[in-house]
Amino acid sequence: KTMLNLIKPVTGEVLFYNEKYSKVRNKIAYVPQRGSVDWDFPTTVFDVVEMGRYGKVGWLKRVSKIDKEKTKEAIAKVGMEEFSDRQISQLSGGQQQRVFLARALVQEAEIYFMDEPFQGVDSKTEKSIIDILKKLRNEGKTVIAVHHDLQTVKEYFDYVTFINVSVVASGPVEEIFTPENIEKTYKNKKLSEREGS
């Protein structure tokens, strides 16, 4: 959230390409957790995905035919074409997640932030999402995801950062994803859960 300028850093600053977030926001896309979204808001799948174009078009300008075509393409990439006119409140959890992934894709960003992109989705949806993320990586894009399923870290990611209040370890997954770093990260989990309850 600090990197996305949603909360202020305690100290220092966050830079992308040596620029502040406000200067490069059109190069950054964000997929939030499903739980942080009002799914009862009356809008369609197409409308939600099309909102991803507003950063390039401008909030007070009308989207062009090209923007609408790009919206259709993004919806197709996540396999949601038949749901294009469906209200988002009528979608399953996995379908909702794919809609927000499509909204990120239509932004044509360089960096993609994803907050628990696989949470609450079935294995088929998870596979389709990871296939899309791998394509982005192969296109030279950067994908940063919050992810807690230790079973899939090695399969899904090239780099890993372990955080427990502060950074425990960070680097290539084959070097950093070790039992020692996992233990350092999770050793006080039960204590912190008790403190937070």
Kindly label every feature range from the protein language model.
Residues 147-148:
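H-loop/switch region of ABC-family ATPase nucleotide-binding domains
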Residues 4:
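Helix-to-loop junction immediately C-terminal to a conserved catalytic motif
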Residues 12-24:
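Conserved ABC transporter NBD signature motif
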Residues 159-173:
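H-loop (His-switch) and adjacent beta-strand-loop-beta switch element
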Residues 112-115:
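Catalytic Walker B motif of ABC-type/P-loop ATPase nucleotide-binding domains
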Residues 87-91, 95:
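Conserved ABC ATPase signature
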Residues 50, 65-83:
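Conserved ABC ATPase "signature" region
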